[in-house]
């Protein structure tokens, strides 16, 4: 296993402090005085302390956001000024890119290369959404009454409660802040308790960028306390949540009490299809990267691989070889290609699925088990023999576990029916040179995002899921509109 780099002095200095909550433009301790520890998942060692915000702190943060929203300076701020704030924040992220990437890797376990990519993605997300400030406009419809004139306008929905997961913390924070500010909202950001450190650093940059007091508030703490309080607060107009389907269901239920607007980006069990005419080398690498990236802790991870029988053995051998060749180690080690899972609990969850799979009749093609030593590592694993009634086939594992299944039918409807036999519908990947086939299969798959031949996900593309993979869309124009209300104004003259 590779050896971690020494912690840079800037990061070491940051970790030496016990971090508070950003409320109304200033840092404060939690009202309870309680703190939470945060660990390096590569070793299990405590690396820092964060404030354990609770209901009282959430209330203070929401009220600060509500005051900021209603202040004339924010209500009348020209859209180019909101754009400038988001660009300034993106510039500061890029300035601090290296310490942020190291901190993200240390806190989450992801390899440094991925952490650097994630930090860059956070900056680009803010810049993309900044471009929408001032570009959302209403319409002037033609009315039936000749002496009437009417128009529509979009207005900010209000205070946004943004709850983010632990798998890509900084990117997720930026994805929530950008569209909310572009739309003219204020917000309270609640990071995952396991990975709050880069969100706290981001809070310092929010202050430095010149955001008005209360426009962006950050409350760390347990989801069952701080997150739950945010979901039911009467002054929160919208909840934007990314995380598990189970937690999303609980948040949706809580939000019903005040009929909040809700956007949910939830779990997935995404299929990957490889046809004989595909670029098989590229498809095998794409399938491997699609499940083993960030140790499989990605919502769109391609965790079910369907390869045509004619190329099945070749594809499975290539993907298994890729899995076995990956270098495990601490995320902060320069040679690491796959880091630890985020926590002991997540490791136990993945190990439980693997045990269930073996008990149900699956066999290891690659990986399996955990290496000796400290940390929350699980070897990248390829399982054969999975059936639709098995948990490894139908449940989101959120770990480096791929099930492989052959298909023989040329009937795309039958193939799509197999893939759609799940409660999830977030994404899918298709590998074929037959573009007609790709279009036809893409239309048959119940998923919000379909990628063909390794196409990427862009900030301009609306992103979200079908079925129990979520409500609404993030990214693109739709992502900004999700933070706005549409008002109709009619005038008789």
Predicted regions and their residues:
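Rossmann-like NAD(P) dinucleotide-binding subdomain of oxidoreductase/dehydrogenase enzymes
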Residues: 138-282
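Glycine-rich loop-to-alpha-helix module at the N-terminal edge of alpha/beta enzyme cores
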Residues: 47-137
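Residue-level signal for inorganic ion chemistry
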Residues: 44, 82, 104, 126, ...
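Short, well-ordered beta-strand elements within core beta-sheets of diverse protein domains
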Residues: 46-53, 70-74, 162, 272-274, ...
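Generic secondary-structure signature for well-ordered alpha-helical cores
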Residues: 67-70, 91-98, 109, 131-135, ...
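Conserved C-terminal structural/oligomerization subdomain of aldehyde/semialdehyde dehydrogenase
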Residues: 45-48, 236, 327, 359, ...
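ALDH superfamily catalytic-core signature
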Residues: 238, 246-387, 410-413, 452
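Terminal low-complexity tails and localization/encapsulation signals of metabolic enzymes
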Residues: 1-50, 84, 88, 138-163, ...
